[in-house]
Amino acid sequence: MIENILKNNNLKVTNQRIKILNIINELGCNSTLKNIINNSNGVDTSTIYRTIKTLEDRNIIEEISGINDDVIYVISDSNKHY
């Protein structure tokens, strides 16, 4: 599923992108930046920021407002069917 999302959006499939998308998918409504970083197991923080920016720019993920104005990242509806 995750690899297809990247391929269908003309992005190179990398371990970091797969890992971050899997984390977002698994955490669901708890996928704040802090939780993504805490669950990334060794992925450099700057890589996480760049990857999230790339995924947002390609509309693969989107931001939603959570409790206490936390930003939560979710996989965009247009990519959930992969």
Residue ranges of each PLM-predicted region?
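Short alpha-helical segments that sit at the start of domains
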Residues: 1-21
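Short helix-capping/hinge SLiMs at alpha-helix to coil transitions
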Residues: 11, 25-28
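Conserved beta-strand edge residues that scaffold enzyme active sites
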Residues: 20, 38, 68-70
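Short acidic, hydrophobic short linear motifs in intrinsically disordered regions
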Residues: 30-39
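Basic amphipathic alpha-helical segments that dock to polyanions
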Residues: 48, 52-58
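Non-DNA-binding regulatory cores of transcription-related proteins
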Residues: 57-82
